[in-house]
């Protein structure tokens, strides 16, 4: 007798449907109007290793290093309140205008140079590359004065939201830890802010929380967090607002090889080495196995520069193809090829002979920037589908456009007094309209306001002329040159010649 049995194989159901994210090209209509906007010369000067505080709770000289991120928050004018070249360009009842970034150039001033850093008390035990003798156990204090140059990095990243960085921080342990236990690590994400330190070759790490000796790395990062852009997270972002595109160049090699002094928290297992024959050789007690290199970025050259060149955005890496939501852009820049630290000297005590104590030495670092953009005017038709999509993406966009969603009708009867200040009724609560808070007010960016820097005369600016050239366009002639009329005698003689020829 045959009996039916269900199949033992697993049955996989289709995945549930997800809301589809579409490109901005699907609902943004581009016009033929382009604008040029540029900043003024942007300068910053400070101490390359640490900030100087001469008054309580007030920084007199900021920390300005060539190893810091420069994050420009570029403010754009509202195109819906902009003077447009045509009155019938769009319908304000059913459409809204937005900006699209189609080109940019980051100008860098100052000469190429290599900046160095160091620590007067760096945890350096032995030279493990060419050790003349076998190093013994560490003494009480083996710190030395060591300086080095850093990894070379050039970066230019553009988006309408701040770039996202990643670093390793101190995590939460599952069980209570004792003094001296290795802290757990946790990968953390945060916005990259202006002044954050880049990865210099020692890893993206929270050094202040994970290196308590304050002698493991140079001075400029000993209490800092070095961040690395989280390209994986930004590339996988649904709407692609954090990163339209990026330019990156990194290089590094190892210059010196050292090891650290201190008790080894995790000793080398016995099965990994053969013990020395006797104590006289000095190898019975193993030397420190905590090795580390000093990084170097090698030579800087103008042949490998990413800056002072125009770049054109044809297709972004994400779904946002250069649309500047919120009328703003975030430009993240790193350039360690111009990280020269300038030494200044001031006379403290005059004398006929040189005495080192008669002079005070100072360090300064200066940076110079100039940013230029080409923007394209675009319009969006506010259909029900588009408004619903934008509301799910970012409801603040519709609020800025004064497009609101009607609340559902209230099912209760509310009380409304006429004389709200009268003492005959109960005290009425003060109704205050909440102020709209800037979502990035708690973060630090370099503000660049381009609200009054827009121009349609592209041929009057260097980047505008480059844009016209690559686009195959020509500027409209400003001066009309009249043609010279032919003389009457010439016309008559020409007619006679034609008649004679016949």
From Swiss-Prot:
One of its GO terms (cellular component) is T=7 icosahedral viral capsid. GO terms for biological process: endocytosis involved in viral entry into host cell; virion attachment to host cell. Residues 478-487 have a biased composition (Basic residues). Residues 478-502 are annotated as: Disordered. It is found in: Virion; Host nucleus. GO terms for molecular function: structural molecule activity. Its main location: virion. Keywords: Capsid protein, Disulfide bond, Host nucleus, Host-virus interaction, Late protein, T=7 icosahedral capsid protein, Viral attachment to host cell, Viral penetration into host cytoplasm, Virion, Virus endocytosis by host, Virus entry into host cell. Belongs to the papillomaviridae L1 protein family. Forms an icosahedral capsid with a T=7 symmetry and a 50 nm diameter. The capsid is composed of 72 pentamers linked to each other by disulfide bonds and associated with L2 proteins. Binds to heparan sulfate proteoglycans on cell surface of basal layer keratinocytes to provide initial virion attachment. This binding mediates a conformational change in the virus capsid that facilitates efficient infection. The virion enters the host cell via endocytosis. During virus trafficking, L1 protein dissociates from the viral DNA and the genomic DNA is released to the host nucleus. Self-assembles into homopentamers. The capsid has an icosahedral symmetry and consists of 72 capsomers, with each capsomer being a pentamer of L1. Interacts with the minor capsid protein L2; this interaction is necessary for viral genome encapsidation. Interacts with protein E2; this interaction enhances E2-dependent replication and transcription activation. This is Major capsid protein L1. It comes from Human papillomavirus 42. The gene is L1.
